[in-house]
A protein has these predicted regions:
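Histidine/lysine/aspartate-rich catalytic loop segments that bind and position anionic ligands
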Residues: 79-105
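A general structural signal marking secondary-structure boundaries and capping sites
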Residues: 5, 81, 120, 146-149
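Residue-level signal for alpha-helical context at structural boundaries
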Residues: 19, 84, 92-95, 130, ...
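Periplasmic c-type cytochrome electron-transfer domains
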Residues: 2-61, 130-141, 164-165, 171
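Conserved beta-strand positions that form and line the central face of beta-propeller blades
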Residues: 98, 122-125
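Sequence/structural segment immediately N-terminal to covalent heme-attachment motifs in c-type
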Residues: 60-83, 96, 111-112, 117-118, ...
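A generic secondary-structure boundary signal that marks alpha-helix termini
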Residues: 10, 39, 75, 121, ...
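Flexible coil segments in periplasmic/lumen-exposed cytochrome c-class electron-transfer proteins
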Residues: 71, 103-109, 124-179
């Protein structure tokens, strides 16, 4: 391995017709680590501002994957409902802010993506551990946690409200369903 035949970059070569050792890239070649042509997807930003939207539709599969990844990477500090009282915090680590405070409820999805990617304060970055699609799944799940704590009647579909209104309530002498 110490002595091997090779050409140095930009060295002349009698082997190739053009006399160069360096070969041109094959058409449509993407340099390793440089496919990041979708700025919104890879940075969470539109221009210099954090993106107010998601780069792809948020499906139940995206939310389920985000939930799974959140439980692994985020819940140790942020806890399972996003109040910032995870097991690590209960053992002395600095408490992160709750996702339910106004500042974070009003933050753009791109902000959360950026924080997961680059870290913030004492939070480390997770760019190496969490792939880009999973980071967006985590952001979607954080939004779901926020909505779960601050939902209004206007957030409930009319059909669901109707079901709730027509559901019989236990009266005198009736037992509630134990289901």
């Amino acid at each position: 391995m110490q002595d091997q035949p090779k050409y140095k970059a930009f060295a002349p070569s009698p082997f190739f017709d053009d006399g160069r050792a360096s070969r041109p890239a094959v058409p449509h070649t993407v340099a390793r680590g440089h496919l990041d042509d979708d700025t919104l997807l890879y940075t969470g930003k539109v221009g210099d501002a954090f993106a107010p939207l998601f780069p792809a539709p948020v499906t139940s599969q995206v939310l389920a994957r985000g939930h799974e990844r959140y439980d692994i990477y985020c819940s140790p500090c942020h806890d399972r409902v996003g109040t910032g009282n995870g097991m690590v915090v209960q053992r002395g680590y600095r408490r992160p802010p709750a996702f339910h405070i106004d500042r974070l409820r009003n933050a753009a999805p791109g902000y959360f993506f950026d924080v997961v990617t680059h870290g913030f304060g004492v939070m480390p970055n997770y760019a190496a551990q969490i792939p880009v699609p999973d980071r967006w799944g985590i952001v979607a799940y954080i939004r779901a946690l926020q909505l779960s704590q601050h939902a209004t009647l206007a957030d409930v579909p009319a059909a669901e409200i109707q079901k709730l209104m027509t559901r019989p309530t236990p009266g005198a002498g009736q037992k509630a369903d134990s289901k």
